[in-house]
């Protein structure tokens, strides 16, 4: 799918181009694109994954920061006049601008490893406009996104992602599928925003703060981490054991803490 125009991957953009056609076909199958859907790809590179999707949907938006790649992308995909290229930084891009009241967007991409976590937080803040997301990420990031309470990788990213979305780790992709080959395994993740939040918080900033405080010293107990925020009476009212470590709490527990602190502060 990807053509052979020369372009050296740029380290500052975190570029690793996917060239394994078998993996590309498998990703497209997981996405399951349909004609007429509004699919947005972040960092299309030379268009390997893009071609597999737009061949079905017949239209597509892509967000690409590397201006030198855009002419290559347009040449590779010249057969698709309904390809819209946005030369922009995905970290600052307003994805809601591509939605309509009738149609949410689907977001896909082989995300640059160096900005994958902040980019996911940026997308989660616009989750109401997104039907689902399929990303290639460093395997450890996917493991963190999908981690459950008690897992060693369960943390701030796990809680906030799962507050907004159902998260599924789909399959692992080895370094040999990329040029240049990264030093670690990658994985495909599916994130599907909840149509109705199962545990809505009254103030999202408070939830973010309580999760950040909770995990700032993950080997310490909740009593220690929330010192000055919650006392023993508060933990009793919440029915949460203050001797637990933060990785034992689920999303609902953190939401209850946030809502409790909002009410307590009046």
From Swiss-Prot:
UniProt GO molecular function: 16S rRNA (adenine(1518)-N(6)/adenine(1519)-N(6))-dimethyltransferase activity; RNA binding
InterPro entries for the chain: KsgA/Erm, rRNA_Ade_diMease-like_C, rRNA_Ade_Mease_Trfase_CS, rRNA_Ade_methylase_Trfase_N, rRNA_adenine_dimethylase, SAM-dependent_MTases_sf
EC number: 2.1.1.182
Catalytic activity: adenosine(1518)/adenosine(1519) in 16S rRNA + 4 S-adenosyl-L-methionine = N(6)-dimethyladenosine(1518)/N(6)-dimethyladenosine(1519) in 16S rRNA + 4 S-adenosyl-L-homocysteine + 4 H(+)
Pfam families: RrnaAD
Location in or out of the cell: Cytoplasm
GO cellular component: a single term: cytosol
Keyword annotations: Cytoplasm, Methyltransferase, RNA-binding, rRNA processing, S-adenosyl-L-methionine, Transferase
CDD domains on file: AdoMet_MTases
Binding residues annotated for S-adenosyl-L-methionine, in chain numbering: 16, 18, 43, 64, 89, 110
Signal peptide: none
Main location: cytoplasm
Gene3D superfamilies membership: Ribosomal RNA adenine dimethylase-like, domain 2, Vaccinia Virus protein VP39
Enzyme class, spelled out: transferase
PROSITE patterns, per the entry: RRNA_A_DIMETH, SAM_RNA_A_N6_MT
Highest taxon listed in the record's lineage: Bacteria
Family, per entry: Belongs to the class I-like SAM-binding methyltransferase superfamily. rRNA adenine N(6)-methyltransferase family. RsmA subfamily.
Function: Specifically dimethylates two adjacent adenosines (A1518 and A1519) in the loop of a conserved hairpin near the 3'-end of 16S rRNA in the 30S particle. May play a critical role in biogenesis of 30S subunits.
Name of the protein this chain belongs to: Ribosomal RNA small subunit methyltransferase A
Organism taxonomic ancestry: Bacteria, Pseudomonadati, Pseudomonadota, Gammaproteobacteria, Oceanospirillales
